[in-house]
Amino acid sequence: MKTLLQLAAITFLIASTATHAQITNPDNLVAPPPANPAQHHALPTADNLQWLWQYTKPTPIGRASDLRVDARFQAILSQDFKQPQAMWGATEAREPLATVIPLFLSEHGTITAEQNRYITIDGCVPSFCPAHGLLWIDLGTAHPLAVFAAVNWTPENHTTEESTANYNLWLFPNRTLDPNILPLALTTSLAHWDARLAEAHRLVPHIAQAVLIEPDGTPQPLDPAQAGANTIAPQPDTTTPHDSTTN
């Protein structure tokens, strides 16, 4: 009798673990009915980010503009990204990172899903696409890993219309990462980002410097190649009008 009870307990634990680890298939996702705008969403937790999948439809670009105005999205940013940022705004009046992220995803925004596990949201600053960003989220873990990648022009020697201009890359993870062993899926996504920009005849930057900003604000220098940068030859933007002096 004791053995039967032990087997039953083990079977229950295995079934519970499998259910918890399952990731919702975005192809089978049914979007919920529109919420009452007067109601505030509760702060999302690590286990309830499956609602993000709905914004990856329709493919191939999803609905980035709708995501940016979803209160749950801003709640995620405020909760997960508290690092100081130095890539945008005057030194004495820099906005919080959680406020800057949507700005870097505003224009030409797309949302894509990969391997039924990863979501990437990318875009650029309106009227100044030399400043652009990508938010990468791994939903395949109990506590999703999110990394915001920001690129901005280094205003020295070359204008943004020149392929020889240099850019900086910042990576902001929502939890501590080893700068020497970044997730392969993340660096692959960053490399694919440049490939998509090249295909769209938009700016492909030459990353001169890269840095990982830990959740506590500690900067960790990175080799740009180690972060997945510079896999595509740099090219100027030939499709998006912008002011090369903006920052």
Predicted feature residues:
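Bacterial N-terminal signal peptides
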Residues: 7-16
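Positively charged n-region of N-terminal signal peptides that target proteins for export
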Residues: 1-5
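Sec/Tat signal peptide C-region and signal peptidase I cleavage site
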Residues: 17-21
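Exposed acidic/polar residues on beta-strands and adjacent loops within beta-sheet cores, strongest
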Residues: 22-247
